[in-house]
């Protein structure tokens, strides 16, 4: 298993992501040939040193006096390139993110009429196709991105003077739920193309997940900054054969809340995306009876779940323990047939394996077994035992 973590401490652009992926081990010649066959560009790859850090630098050369393309023209170019299906889907998805962001910012609901400006040139097309091809070739099981340094100040572009991050970039970050922060450099450090590529491939994380570094890559940016203008990427190998997952733990103490309210909150949190909910009795100061509410959640869901807890319980705050690293088995739901007293029934079982396919556990789905118990008159405990017995023979 491999995990890729982008660490954009100096921002990110399309060419930086492409260069970083190449520096991590993607086939330089294969990606170069693909890019040059798919867009009217030439691609140069060279090593540079940015403030003491060696990095790969990718330069895309485009035809002079190139016209600004519309979104439909970009789509037609991508489809005409006859890319592999997975690569075409990624490329189209990334450009759709940029188109929807531009449309939202400029109040243009019809994407067919949308004109790209900075991202409508052939270099953006090359960056997206090249980055997608390189990242797919790394064959990572998961991709994460730490908070992105977006820079600060203002920029001059086709729409005039805009704040940093540019409105379209900010919209991409909002929809992609990526973490970001301002920086001390008075410059745009995150481009719309960079934001769209990262939001397509990566999930947000506040810190590096646990693992062993097996490769480190740096993609160089064009500008010279006070610090190294590079995008860092790290390939990690998890320390366990279990699958890694990034979670946050939300916790609060609640007193003067009825059991009915807590029961409703339990169901509401699960329906809103909580991975698990636990409510435990506790004793607070002065001997007051209370409950500890603990929720396991994906980082992108934490804010809405915390708000729900506060609204429903009247709690004055929720503790968030961020970026906890969870190791878990890969779990699949399989349907099997079992025979009971001459009758055949179908039921679901949960099959857990590690990353190498070793069987860790099998558990019968209670609701299915409950229905079979009612239909057959056999105790549900016996149904579950027989179901798991059959499943072990099938999946061991």
Swiss-Prot record:
Transmembrane segments: none annotated. It comes from the Archaea. The keyword Cytoplasm does not apply. Pfam families: Ni_insertion. The keyword Lipid metabolism does not apply. Keywords: Nickel. Belongs to the LarC family. PANTHER family: NICKEL INSERTION PROTEIN-RELATED, PYRIDINIUM-3,5-BISTHIOCARBOXYLIC ACID MONONUCLEOTIDE NICKEL INSERTION PROTEIN. NCBIfam families: nickel pincer cofactor biosynthesis protein LarC. This is Putative nickel insertion protein. It comes from Methanosarcina acetivorans (strain ATCC 35395 / DSM 2834 / JCM 12185 / C2A).
